[in-house]
Amino acid sequence: MKLIDVVKMGEALSNPIRVKILYILNKQPKNIYELAKELELSRPVVYAHLRKLEDADLVESDLVLEGSRAKRIYKAKEFKFYIDNEIIKKLFENE
């Protein structure tokens, strides 16, 4: 893992709303409308959080056709995040 990846993942996980989005998407993939409704937030706010999670490689999305309409479905990716002094040391020694 590279330093930038650790920073992106840490930043993505530092917000309680994003952690809740991961919790919801771990149970079941959802579109942005469903997430916004469940979180009681606007779609633009949820979208901004999803972009941060996608950038950290914690969430992925697929475009799915439903009738004549396309919907983007978001799902949580499998990940493990662990950091300790030894990992931090290796991050900077491998630059």
UniProtKB/Swiss-Prot annotation:
Signal sequence annotation: none
Molecular function, one GO term: DNA binding
Keywords: DNA-binding, Transcription, Transcription regulation
Entries under SUPFAM superfamilies matching the protein: Winged helix' DNA-binding domain (SSF46785)
Gene3D superfamilies: Winged helix-like DNA-binding domain superfamily/Winged helix DNA-binding domain
Domain of life the protein comes from: Archaea
Record-given protein name: Uncharacterized HTH-type transcriptional regulator MJ0229
